[in-house]
UniProtKB/Swiss-Prot annotation:
Plays an important role in the de novo pathway and in the salvage pathway of purine nucleotide biosynthesis. Catalyzes the first committed step in the biosynthesis of AMP from IMP. Plays a role in the regulation of adult life span. Pathway: Purine metabolism; AMP biosynthesis via de novo pathway; AMP from IMP: step 1/2. One of its GO terms (biological process) is 'de novo' AMP biosynthetic process. It is found in: Cytoplasm. The keyword Nucleotide-binding applies. Belongs to the adenylosuccinate synthetase family. One of its GO terms (molecular function) is GTP binding. It is an enzyme of class 6 (ligase). This is Adenylosuccinate synthetase. It comes from Drosophila melanogaster. Its EC number is 6.3.4.4. CDD domains: AdSS. Substrate binds at residues 320-326.
Length: 447
């Protein structure tokens, strides 16, 4: 028997006799740009049909807005699907949790009408804790960088992930175990940070007393989420994952170092929830009809002009978490091709198309070029290279009529439909939904 035949037999054997362990799949919603694409609204729309909604990474540096029954909810740690009282919300092991912020968020949204959270929120016992001193260190590190700051949210996310990576972080499960052991670990991690940052001041005894109270408050919510999710999949439960931040903020694939401290791409879903690759079903890339970015870092299609101002004003582009104005620019196809390559989008939700309604013409970035005019066949791997590219634009006619009341794709202006089809054609990924307003009712089903 030849080597190729032998290899073929081995490969065939590899795929024979597979048993279907899971009765359902995990669908994933991911931001395809630099965040603020409208993931929360998409999750809210889909959550009405699922059993479980999960957060897998990040912390309260994320900000999602959901409008339900005329009420606007702001979420930072809670999954956006929590507004659906029929589904369970899971905060996975890959999330870092600042407990004071979590309970503040719960109280604020309960005041707006969020109900019965105690029966449908589950927090992983393996999630790491963010402490106040992490936030102080975050602010100090940003201040030290001066004009070269990264524009972080100063929520302590980076320092908490640093503690996790250096193996001196503290997990939720440890808070709920032997409190004497928790106290020892807490004193140790504080001592380490004070040694590195002598100006921070931590009242250790006061913090321990505070966290003893938090242990009692958080205890009813905490479970082994890995077992919970695998049991749910074996029982055919439908699961939706809400990625925080976005692909271009991913610690590995984003515009490093102007990124967040976790994997906001598809890989972060697996590691942040303890799921194997074969459980993944649909991967929905959420794309804003133009591009925005909060904070510092390269932005090839940014418009520092009247167009940028118009997009910022019409789109109400202010960060949910930071309250900073977002930088605005044209849609960037090379960027989206790159994030689609990394994440494997199976479909797209295009949001905020209505913000472009008043423009007589619309530009779309279709290629990056080197200074010598040569087109790039890859997304630049360094900010130096990205800062040195030239952008080639396609100029499309606008539609100059309101799309806000449109609820059928074929009723959109012809030029608006062409804009959607261009994105579909360039990415070779179907656009399944188009958003033309704030509420969930303003999302058009394309197919």
């Amino acid at each position: 028997m030849s080597a190729s035949a032998t290899n073929g037999t081995h490969y065939e054997q590899l795929h024979q006799g597979r048993t279907k362990m899971y009765k359902s799949k995990v669908d994933v919603v991911l931001g395809a740009q630099w965040g603020d694409e409208g993931k929360g609204k998409v999750v809210d729309m889909l959550a009405s049909d699922v059993d479980i909604v999960c957060r897998c990474q990040g912390g309260n540096n994320a900000g999602h807005t959901v409008v339900a029954n005329g009420t606007e909810f702001d979420f930072h740690l809670l999954p956006s699907g929590v507004v659906n009282e029929k589904c369970v919300s899971v905060i996975g092991n890959g999330v870092v949790i600042h407990l004071p912020s979590l309970f503040d968020e719960v109280l604020k949204n309960e005041a707006k009408g969020l109900q019965h959270l105690e029966n449908r929120l589950i927090i992983s016992d393996r999630a790491h804790l963010v402490f106040d001193f992490h936030q102080h260190v975050d602010g100090m590190q940003e201040a030290e960088k001066g004009g070269k700051s990264l524009g972080t949210t100063k929520k302590g996310i980076g320092p908490a992930y640093s503690s996790k990576a250096t193996r001196n972080g503290i997990r939720v499960g440890e808070l709920l175990g032997d409190f004497n052991l928790f106290s020892e670990k807490f004193k140790s991690i504080v001592a380490t940070h004070v040694r590195l940052f002598p100006s921070i001041n931590v009242d250790v005894e006061a913090e321990l007393a505070r966290y003893k109270d938090y242990a009692d408050k958080v205890r009813p919510y905490v479970k082994d989420t890995i077992c919970f999710l695998h049991t749910a999949l074996r029982n055919g439960k439908t699961i939706l994952v809400e990625g925080a931040n976005a692909a271009m903020l991913d610690i590995d694939f984003g515009t490093y170092p102007y990124v967040t401290s976790s994997n906001c791409s598809i890989g972060g879903v697996l590691t942040g929830l303890g799921l194997p690759p074969q459980t993944i079903g649909e991967v929905i890339g959420v794309v804003k009809a133009y591009t925005t970015r909060v904070g510092d870092g390269p932005f090839p299609t940014e418009q520092l002009n009247d167009i940028g101002d118009l997009l910022q004003t019409r789109g109400f582009e202010v960060g949910v978490t930071t309250k900073r104005k977002r930088r605005c620019g044209w849609l960037d196809i090379p960027l989206l091709k790159y994030t689609s390559l990394v994440n494997g989008y199976t479909c797209i939700c295009l949001t905020k198309l209505d913000i472009l309604d008043t423009l007589p013409e619309i530009k779309v970035a279709v290629a990056y070029k080197k200074p010598n005019g040569e087109k790039l066949d890859h997304f630049p791997g360094t900010i130096a290279e990205l800062g040195n590219i030239e952008v080639e634009y396609a100029v499309l006619p606008g539609w100059q009529t309101s799309t806000e009341e449109v609820r059928n794709f074929k009723e959109l202006p012809e030029n608006a439909q062409s804009y959607v089809r261009l994105l579909e054609s360039e990415l070779s990924v179907p656009v399944r939904w188009v958003g033309v307003g704030k509420g969930r009712e303003s999302i058009i089903n394309v197919h």
